[in-house]
A protein has these predicted regions:
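Long, charged, low-complexity, helical-prone intrinsically disordered regions
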Residues: 1-390
Length: 390
């Protein structure tokens, strides 16, 4: 059996929850979206807004950004940990990350000394302060220590990061995006399942979550969706393929233009057939490169014919597009790139650049939908107007 790239990308768009904005949103819709996606990447760049808020916007439309913060730090429905990268994850999945925490705890002391050149007693000192004083952030480690000398803020931050990775500390809150760490026993809700899964159960969990999130996948997609280093997957691509072959409820097929075998849940096979000729989504969405759908550049290139170019790390003279440009999804195609920037002082969304993909011809319908989507986007960021430059 072989399916078209068109069907594969259409299934992914549906699986990613992009095709329909809900009529209304609440904290449950935020948590449910993250639960379905498996994880939501956190990033510090805020040219428009931080990445996690934008990925949710592409699926929920207008929503209260406080819903995400409250769900994580007040209601304790979500926790921060390494999944694809630094992510929000549902507490329903917590136990599947215990293995990664254990591995990091075993490596922690050696890696800390190697990275900082400091004695491991710094870890104990930082932990003691948090035990005595409650949640602390890196800024709290400035000024003289009681026994003389000075706190090295960078070293203490590294210590907290390592203990966070080891599951000893958790992020209890963020203030102005600054992470506050507390003892895990003070953060972890009592209802959370902390029974470690078996080795096989853990691997199957990450495979099935990738299938549910992406639709038609290759084995490498599992290692790239849940980054193999982040979750300490411990599986080669070949080993994942052997597991996929043995899973109940999973079908095999080829995708046009790729010699590798693809896999999908049986429940999605009939939908793949339907999607060959029927795909009702014909709207516009602005995506970011930190969006779950855009993580795997090779996958995006194959299914959409779109070359991902995250240019924030490039010098200006090496950029083809803009510093923080966004891919534009129209129906089942990535058709353009746009570079918005938020002027918060003037309450203005500034469009610094816009580029259509080769072969795409703008229509009146597309232009209207793009403008409508930008208006919704601007309102979400509390911009009173949109200004196009150039």
């Amino acid at each position: 059996m072989e399916i078209s790239r068109e069907s594969a990308r259409r299934l992914m768009i549906e699986k990613q929850g992009i095709t329909q904005f809900p009529e209304s949103n609440n904290k449950k819709s935020v948590v449910d979206t993250i639960n379905h996606l498996g994880c939501l990447q956190i990033d510090t760049i805020s040219v428009i807004e931080r990445a996690h808020y934008l990925t949710l916007w592409s699926r929920l439309g207008s929503y209260d950004k406080n819903y995400l913060d409250e769900s994580a730090y007040k209601d304790k429905k979500l926790f921060e940990y390494w999944a694809h990268a630094a992510c929000f994850v549902s507490y329903d999945h917590y136990r599947f990350y215990l293995h990664a925490m254990k591995v990091r705890e075993e490596e922690m002391k050696v890696r800390f000394v190697k990275r900082t050149g400091k004695d491991v007693e710094v870890l104990d000192q930082v932990l003691a302060r948090i035990k005595n004083e409650g949640p602390l952030c890196s800024k709290d480690f400035e000024g003289p220590k009681k026994n003389g000398g000075w706190w090295n803020r960078k070293t203490e931050k590294v210590a907290m990061d390592y203990m966070y990775g080891a599951g000893i500390l958790m992020v209890s809150d963020r203030v102005s995006f600054q992470r506050y760490y507390d003892l895990s026993e003070n953060v972890l809700p009592s209802w959370v399942d902390v029974e470690p899964p078996s080795y096989d159960e853990r691997i199957e969990f990450f495979i099935r979550k990738t299938l549910k999130s992406l639709g038609a996948i290759k084995p490498i997609d599992v290692r790239k969706y849940y980054h193999h280093h982040s979750v300490k997957l411990g599986q080669t691509t070949k080993q994942i393929e052997e597991r996929l072959k043995g899973l109940d409820g999973v079908s095999r097929f080829k995708v046009e233009g790729d010699k590798n075998t693809h896999y999908s849940l049986d429940e999605d096979i009939e939908r793949l057939d339907t999607l060959e000729g029927d795909f009702s989504f014909n709207d516009v969405r602005l995506l970011i490169y930190f969006d779950n759908m855009m993580w795997n550049r090779e996958r995006v290139q194959h299914l959409f014919g779109f070359e991902s170019k995250l240019e924030i790390y490039l010098p200006q003279d090496q950029r083809v597009y803009g510093y923080y440009h966004l891919p534009v999804l129209y129906g089942d195609q990535l058709v353009a790139r746009i570079e918005p920037k938020m002027d918060r002082k003037e309450k203005k969304l500034i469009i610094r650049g816009y580029w259509t993909e080769p072969g795409f011809n703008e229509t009146e319908e597309y232009t209207e939908k793009l403008e409508r989507n930008l208006s919704t986007f601007a309102a979400f960021h509390k911009a009173d107007e949109i200004e196009w430059l150039g």
